[in-house]
């Protein structure tokens, strides 16, 4: 990853000398996956159940890219003397190899043997061999300075005490998600980076380690499990998501689970790193990951493979290995979040986004300060095919991180903006797993600060995660209504917590506006799906169309109040529920009324017998508090009614015969 950040403050990069030998690493691409021992009919043999569940949830069909590379092909390469198989990509059907004897004669011999295999499509040099772990001249990964960051002041009673990371969460209203229980639980994030130095001892990850949130690690460069001794860049990016030091530092999704994969070779800049990136993404998919956070990017390669550098025309989302792999990851249902790059400074001859941020299914993230001012280094769009890039922006200027030396410091780069956004996007998706990855990306664009006027610096702008949750809730929620015996029952389904509430409003025939007729409190400590029902008395309502709308209040705090209408329904009242006393044949009297007791009687006089006489009592809000069924013959009958459980106040007593309203009387309980 070249120049992914050009601004680092005072901490000197780790460095050793690099020794480059003759070209020794090659990419072998196969023609097909013939004679494969695996079949799409038995996917559990090569994909985890969690990976399969994702495909089922979003209706994603398996295809040939899911099949492992034919083992016989790989074994044939491995059997060649001096050949070491490095990483295998099933999505791209290709293998990287190392030739340990780099004499010209041996290189030629190996190449000839490989070319003779009928299943080989091509063989190309992809990197030189490397000894050491330093950076080549000109290559920089952002590393935070050693200066402690000042703590922001938290004026709200949030679930987390964020300490110094408060402002980079609040710029997105991310604390709102955390406060309603969306903190990353049940979600799995795969991080692709250049190393996670000291992640095993950094205190900010104590809870992640103790709770088993780090599910696995792998180094695709050194082909080993250990990622603790490599470059600190990944550790710092990891802290932006997973850090958890109450009162000092909290990441954007501290309760998520993680895979930490090293795919970046910090000491070089060769195309093999794009191949490694794809291999890392594949492993996240196979393991059942939900999100990929990648603070890596590519466009220029070093000698002697500089001819393989990407022209800007390659930044179209469909050309580079990394972009193809990123879009395949998205096709498998994962949310891919990538740093836009840091070549935006006017002095940089490139100036544009880097791959795989150019992927059309990738959420590319630019960098701003906590005040929303873009960093002068953030790479500009659009992509070469005209896509708005970056898609959104997050805090990448003076981002607060937990560094590899157990300190809290700050640094600049889209590499830090990326995990901040990835973590919050993960928390949002946690609440709406009914929606797929692309719906989450679309929503984040729609709630950006420049949603209607995207530009080439921050794309659709800085997403508001509270607004995103409201929009997704509106799309998710449903409502229905039904009428029986002059009463509407409204049922709705939405997502909430106990701190939220609903207001039900009605517009009756002849009315020009809506009137609030009832409330319903939310339930539970975690944001989740719930179903509610309220009844509305239609006494004295004319026949016609009645409209109801449901307003969900998401944030009841005065300073941060947020509410929106989640659904509107209409019902048709076919017969009027208006009653009059002018009926010489029917008479209804409540005795005594007012009543000081816990009972009263209904004196009913009708000329005909009524076998299905229904009595319903409603309070002033329209809620039914009593309902009973009786029968009577012609003439007068006295029906006693107990109201022992009712509070003092005014009620409406309605009498129905054969489903038709006979009368409604007002009752006052003293």
Residue positions per predicted region:
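Residue-level detector of functionally pivotal "anchor" positions at catalytic/ligand-binding pockets or at interdomain
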Residues: 469-484, 561-591, 607
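Inhibitory N-terminal propeptides of secreted protease zymogens
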Residues: 23-143
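Catalytic-core environment of secreted peptidases
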Residues: 207-212, 217, 303, 367-416, ...
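C-terminal outer-membrane/trafficking sorting elements
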Residues: 19-21, 500-547, 551-561, 583-591, ...
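Substrate-binding/access-modulating region of protease and related hydrolase catalytic domains
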Residues: 178, 185, 244-247, 260-361, ...
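Protease zymogen maturation seam
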Residues: 111-187, 200-204, 304-305
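Hydrolase catalytic cores
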Residues: 238, 261-265, 290, 394-458
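Subtilisin-like serine protease catalytic core
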Residues: 23, 40, 165, 175-273, ...
């Amino acid at each position: 990853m070249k120049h992914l950040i050009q601004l680092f403050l005072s901490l000197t990069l780790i460095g050793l000398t690099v020794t480059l030998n003759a070209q020794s690493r090659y990419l072998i691409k196969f023609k097909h996956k013939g004679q494969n021992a695996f079949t799409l009919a038995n996917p559990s043999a090569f994909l985890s159940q969690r990976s399969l569940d994702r495909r089922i949830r979003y209706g994603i069909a398996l295809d040939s890219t899911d099949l492992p590379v034919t083992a016989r092909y790989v074994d044939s390469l491995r059997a060649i003397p001096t050949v070491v198989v490095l990483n295998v990509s099933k999505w791209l059907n290709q293998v990287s190899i190392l030739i340990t004897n780099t004499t010209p004669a041996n290189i030629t011999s190996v190449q000839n043997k490989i070319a003779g295999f009928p299943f080989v499509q091509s063989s190309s040099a992809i990197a030189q061999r490397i000894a050491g772990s330093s950076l080549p001249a000109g290559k920089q990964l952002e590393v935070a300075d050693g200066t402690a960051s000042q703590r922001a002041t938290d004026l709200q009673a949030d679930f987390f005490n964020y300490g110094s990371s408060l402002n980079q969460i609040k710029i997105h209203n991310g604390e709102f998600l955390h406060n309603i229980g969306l903190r990353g639980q049940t979600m799995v994030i795969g991080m692709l980076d250049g190393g996670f130095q000291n992640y095993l001892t950094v205190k900010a990850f104590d809870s992640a380690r103790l709770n088993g949130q780090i599910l696995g690690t792998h180094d695709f460069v050194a082909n080993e499990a250990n990622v603790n001794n490599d470059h600190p860049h990944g550790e710092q990016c990891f802290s932006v998501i997973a850090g958890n030091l109450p009162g000092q530092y909290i990441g954007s999704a501290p309760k998520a689970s993680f895979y930490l994969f090293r795919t970046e070779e910090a000491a070089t800049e060769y195309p093999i790193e794009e191949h490694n990136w794809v291999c890392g993404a594949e492993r996240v998919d196979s393991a059942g990951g939900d999100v990929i956070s990648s603070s890596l990017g590519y466009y220029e390669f070093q000698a002697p493979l500089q001819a393989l550098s990407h022209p800007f025309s390659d930044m179209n989302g469909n050309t580079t290995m990394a972009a193809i792999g990123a879009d395949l990851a998205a096709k498998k249902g994962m949310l891919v979040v990538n740093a836009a790059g840091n070549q935006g400074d006017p002095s940089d001859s490139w100036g544009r986004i880097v791959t795989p941020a150019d992927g059309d299914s990738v959420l590319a993230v630019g960098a701003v300060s906590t005040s929303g001012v873009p960093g002068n280094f953030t790479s500009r769009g659009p992509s070469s095919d005209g896509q708005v890039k970056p898609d959104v922006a997050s805090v990448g200027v003076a981002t607060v991180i937990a560094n590899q030396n157990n300190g809290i410091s700050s640094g600049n780069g889209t590499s830090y903006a990326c995990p901040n956004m990835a973590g919050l996007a993960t928390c949002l998706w946690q609440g709406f797993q009914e929606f797929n990855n692309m719906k989450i990306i679309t929503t984040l664009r729609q709630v950006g600060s420049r949603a209607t006027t995207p530009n080439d610096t921050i794309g659709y702008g800085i997403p508001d995660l509270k607004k995103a949750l409201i929009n997704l809730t509106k799309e998710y929620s449903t409502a229905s209504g039904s009428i029986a015996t002059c009463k509407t029952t409204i049922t709705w389904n939405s997502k909430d917590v106990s701190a939220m509430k609903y207001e039900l409003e009605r517009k009756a025939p002849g009315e020009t506006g809506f009137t609030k007729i009832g409330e319903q409190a939310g339930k539970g400590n975690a944001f989740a799906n719930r179903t509610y029902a309220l009844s509305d008395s239609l006494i004295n309502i004319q026949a016609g169309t009645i409209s109801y709308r449901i307003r969900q209040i998401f944030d009841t705090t005065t300073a941060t109040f947020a509410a929106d209408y989640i659904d509107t329904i209409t019902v048709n009242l076919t017969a009027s529920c208006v009653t009059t006393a002018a009926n010489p044949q029917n008479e209804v009297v409540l005795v005594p009324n007012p009543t000081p007791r816990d009972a009263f009687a209904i004196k009913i006089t009708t000329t005909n017998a009524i076998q299905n006489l229904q009595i319903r009592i409603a309070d002033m809000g329209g809620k039914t508090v009593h309902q009973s069924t009786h029968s009577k013959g012609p003439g007068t009958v006295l029906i006693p009614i107990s109201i022992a459980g009712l509070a003092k106040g005014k009620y409406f007593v309605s009498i129905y015969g054969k489903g038709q309203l006979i009368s409604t009387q007002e009752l006052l309980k003293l």
